[in-house]
Amino acid sequence: MASTGLQILGIVLTLLGWVNALVSCALPMWKVTAFIGNSIVVAQMVWEGLWMSCVVQSTGQMQCKVYDSLLALPQDLQAARALCVVTLLIVLLGLLVYLAGAKCTTCVEDRNSKSRLVLISGIIFVISGVLTLIPVCWTAHSIIQDFYNPLVADAQKRELGASLYLGWAASGLLLLGGGLLCCACSSGGTQGPRHYMACYSTSVPHSRGPSEYPTKNYV
């Protein structure tokens, strides 16, 4: 019963992490304008994402433009785009593996095989959490490094956008969800041999010793 609860909690956290990763990948808010120095009086804000950049006016109007070329992106955003797409696909693969091994499905009948599939899905989710963390931390490091670089003009400096925080949340949820699935598999797997030994001990007939047979007097 406890392993079933861990599986449900783990898969729910994983789904939330996947949704956060998808939103983080889609939103053009990886880098936002830093209002410092002369840029304080600027009446517009620049958002930079993985797929497009947007300019938000002080009046609320927003204009977005898709990047013309992948090579025009900075190195950190190029890597982030590739890793985010790979992560989303890996999570979908992990979900398919989990569905094959879930207790509520009949794709696989053997209980040990189901436990192995759940364990594999948990490992896949942990790997996807690490892959989500890499581009987010890389982009954050690049933003902070440029922010404190005196050679970079104030108008070109950026701050951490909302997509980075969503990416960190997605990574944490995927790591936690995958870890719970691995724990559920280990806790559920330890009950199988004990149950088998109990059934085996009750099914084996008890052998009698010579002294236990009733003695009869023969005339």
From Swiss-Prot:
Residues 29-81, 138-163 are extracellular. The lineage of its organism: Eukaryota, Metazoa, Chordata, Craniata, Vertebrata. GO terms for biological process: calcium-independent cell-cell adhesion via plasma membrane cell-adhesion molecules; cell-cell junction organization. This is Claudin-6. The modification Phosphoserine is found at S201, S203, S207, S211. Directly interacts with TJP1/ZO-1, TJP2/ZO-2 and TJP3/ZO-3. Interacts with CLDN1, CD81 and OCLN. The keyword Protein transport does not apply. Residues 218-219 are annotated as: Interactions with TJP1, TJP2 and TJP3. The keyword Transmembrane helix applies. GO terms for molecular function: identical protein binding; structural molecule activity; virus receptor activity. Keywords: Cell junction, Cell membrane, Membrane, Phosphoprotein, Tight junction, Transmembrane, Transmembrane helix. GO terms for cellular component: apicolateral plasma membrane; bicellular tight junction; membrane; plasma membrane. Pfam families: PMP22_Claudin (PF00822). Plays a major role in tight junction-specific obliteration of the intercellular space, through calcium-independent cell-adhesion activity. The gene is Cldn6. It comes from Mus musculus (Mouse). InterPro entries: Claudin (IPR006187), Claudin6 (IPR003925), Claudin_CS (IPR017974), PMP22/EMP/MP20/Claudin (IPR004031).
